[in-house]
Each structure stands twice: as structure tokens, then as C-alpha cells.
Curated annotation (Swiss-Prot):
EC number: 2.1.1.192
GO annotation (BP), single: rRNA base methylation
Family matches, as InterPro entries: Aldolase_TIM, Methyltransferase_A, RNA_MTrfase_RlmN, rRNA_lsu_MTrfase_RlmN/Cfr, rSAM
Domain of life: Bacteria
Listed transmembrane segments: none
Matches recorded under HAMAP family: RNA_methyltr_RlmN
Protein's name in the database: Probable dual-specificity RNA methyltransferase RlmN 1
Organism: Protochlamydia amoebophila (strain UWE25)
Note: Reaction proceeds by a ping-pong mechanism involving intermediate methylation of a conserved cysteine residue.
């Protein structure tokens, strides 16, 4: 029986080396060298000196390894922000966003195709959930950004398509690969996981024994009545429970939580809303990221006037909250916050992925 290929993008260095040595009966340290070369350079062309006297072993390791990553189907830029699409084997699109910065850029990656959270202001939510991404599909996004598009990745944010905690096990496995010192070697504080308020995910995260990523919470409303309308998850986890989860995360990790708040004209953008927001966030170690609403394919909302954005921001700052008003980028290529959707995929049937050896 033919041995299924071992997908290198689905493994930490330890589990990859274990899988190789299990099949060959040797080669643990040599497999780690292959892993390190692939993740740090994007190819294995520099391995020959390390395998000078073990060419047969190298060929055996390579024959057992699946080095494949998904192809780019589209690569767009508006001069400030980039967006690339990856085509999956079941003919779906994974969307990722590149945000250049002076000291290295931020890569916004997806954890699902579609999303079942149904947030009223989000194009992805209107798709519904088609399926979770695999570890290989999540890691392909970074691999392509770094080695095919030559984008300098300093930070990674799970803020693309999907609710990361709805695909918890895979996202956390990807996190461990991203932070593997023999691989990409990103620091845990360079990675942020954003949630719409999935409390099980927050509390599962607190039970992890390894260093944790940063946490962002997409809040978008300062009271239950409004949040119920904008974010259906609030009906399951109302603000009182969400507050406690944020408080517990801050206390147990000593980390500051990022609060994302999409400002929507005449919905959640008044000074009264700002007052309610400061009252809700009182006592929490947070910073606030204000995001002007971005237009979608079938709009029911609008972005506030610039004066409204500035007044809302000023009020929060006056109350002592560290607040950033995000500059709108990526609208023209549908790469801005809330725009990563494809309603044409909504009617696609689920597809069973072939199993790679893990």
C-alpha cells in the first residue's frame, strides 16, 4: 500500500521529523534540516552540503514529503494594500490581505471559507459557512505571501474570512507551526486572533500551556439591543458575559486586548454610543481600533461623515482610552475590513477534501 504524502505545511518541525523517522526508521535530525530550509527559504536548494554523505537519505525524505501549496488565482493592489486569492482543489477562493508598513508588513489571513456568524455589516457573513480551512491552506497563505510575492511579513492577524475560534483546533495548530523556532519562527506576540465573541474559544485559549497569541474582539456595538441586530452571536453570548471573558483574558495573560469597532452611519456612531462604549470597557486593559464602514456588493449601510468619525475618536481619547481611527485602505479592490466575501460561492456544495498524512 502506497504511503500517503506527509504535508510539510501541516506539521511542526517535531511532528514532521517524527513522521519521517517513523517511516524510515532514521533521519529525525536530517528531517528537521529539510523542514528548516523549506520554511526559512521557501526551497531546498541549499541542502546538499548538509547531506554530503547522506544523499540517499535526503532522497528518501523528499520522496515522503508533500511540499505543495495552493496556487494564486488572483493578485491585486491599489498601491497601498494588496489582496491575493488562492484557488482550492474544490474550486473555492481563499482571500488574504497584505498591508505594507515601514518596519515590515501585516498579513491578514483567513481561517474559513465563508462564515456562519452572520454579522450584518460583513460580506463574508452573508456567504454563510462553506467549510473550514485546513492547516495546509492556512499556512499556504503565509508561504505564498513571503516566498512567491516577496512580502516582508512582520505580523499576522487572523482577521480574514471566517471566525477563527469556529475552527479552533486547526487555527491553533497553525499558530504552533507559525511560531516553531525551526520554521517561520514568528513570535507569539506578532500573531493576533480576532473573534466576534466566541467565548468557548477565549476560554480554551486560556487553557493552552504554550505562549499565547494576542486577542482582538470585534465589538461594534455598546449595548445588547444594538449588538443583537448587528451581530447574532450576541444573542448567545451577551455583553455581560463577553466583558467577563475579556477581563479574564487580560488578567490571566497580562495582555492588552484589541477592541475593533466598525463605525456605521446612524447605527452606532453617536456620542451617546461612545459614552456607552467607554462605560462598557471601563476596567479592561484594552486599546480601541475604530474602523469606518466599508462599502459592499449590496449595501444597506454607509460610513459616517469624517466629522462624526473624528468626534467619536476624540471622545474616547478624552476618556483615557488608547484609540486609533483606521485609515481606509483597500476599498477599491474589496480588501478592506468587512469586504472579503464572494456571494457567487454561496450556492457551492460542500466538497470532501482528500486526506494527507499528518
Amino acid at each position: 500500500m502506497k504511503i500517503p504524502p506527509i504535508s510539510i505545511l501541516s506539521h511542526t518541525s517535531e511532528s514532521y521529523a517524527n513522521a519521517i523517522s517513523h517511516e524510515l526508521g532514521k533521519g529525525f535530525q536530517h528531517a528537521k534540516l529539510v523542514y528548516q530550509e523549506w520554511f526559512r527559504r521557501g526551497n531546498i536548494s541549499g541542502l546538499n552540503p548538509a547531506f554530503k554523505n547522506a544523499q540517499a537519505l535526503l532522497q528518501n525524505i523528499l520522496s515522503l514529503t508533500d511540499f505543495s501549496f495552493l496556487p494564486i488565482s488572483q493578485n491585486l493592489t491599489d498601491g497601498q494594500t494588496g489582496k491575493f486569492l488562492i484557488k482550492t482543489i474544490d474550486d473555492l477562493d481563499i482571500k488574504s490581505v497584505l498591508i505594507p508598513m515601514q518596519a515590515g508588513g501585516t498579513l491578514c489571513i483567513s481561517s474559513q471559507i465563508g462564515c456562519q456568524m452572520g454579522c450584518a455589516f460583513c460580506e463574508t457573513g452573508r456567504m454563510g459557512l462553506l467549510r473550514n480551512l485546513t492547516t495546509q491552506e492556512i499556512l499556504s497563505q503565509l508561504f505564498i505571501a513571503k516566498f512567491r510575492l516577496h512580502f516582508s511579513v512582520r505580523n499576522i492577524v487572523f482577521m480574514g474570512m471566517g471566525e477563527p475560534f469556529d475552527n479552533y483546533d486547526t487555527v491553533m495548530h497553525a499558530f504552533r507551526i507559525l511560531t516553531d523556532s525551526h520554521g517561520f519562527g514568528l513570535g507569539n506576540n506578532r500573531i493576533t486572533i480576532s473573534t466576534s465573541g466566541c467565548l468557548e474559544g477565549i476560554y480554551r485559549l486560556l487553557q493552552e500551556t504554550t505562549p499565547l497569541p494576542n486577542l482582538a474582539v470585534s465589538l461594534n456595538a455598546p449595548n445588547d439591543e444594538l449588538r443583537n441586530k448587528l451581530m447574532p452571536i450576541n444573542k448567545k453570548y451577551p455583553l455581560k458575559e463577553l466583558y467577563q471573558a475579556i477581563y479574564d483574558f487580560c488578567k490571566q495573560t497580562s495582555k492588552q486586548v484589541l477592541i475593533a469597532y466598525v463605525l456605521i452611519k446612524e447605527q452606532n456612531d453617536s456620542i451617546e454610543h461612545a459614552k456607552q462604549l467607554t462605560n462598557f470597557l471601563s476596567g479592561l486593559n484594552v486599546k480601541i481600533n475604530l474602523i469606518p464602514y466599508n462599502p459592499q456588493s449590496r449595501d444597506r449601510f454607509q460610513s459616517p461623515e469624517q466629522s462624526t468619525l473624528e468626534n467619536f475618536t476624540s471622545y474616547l481619547r478624552e476618556k483615557g482610552f488608547y484609540t486609533l481611527l483606521r485609515q481606509t485602505k483597500g476599498q477599491k479592490i474589496m480588501a478592506a475590513c468587512g469586504q472579503l466575501g464572494n456571494l457567487e460561492l454561496k450556492r457551492k456544495k460542500p466538497f470532501i477534501l482528500p486526506i494527507l498524512k499528518e
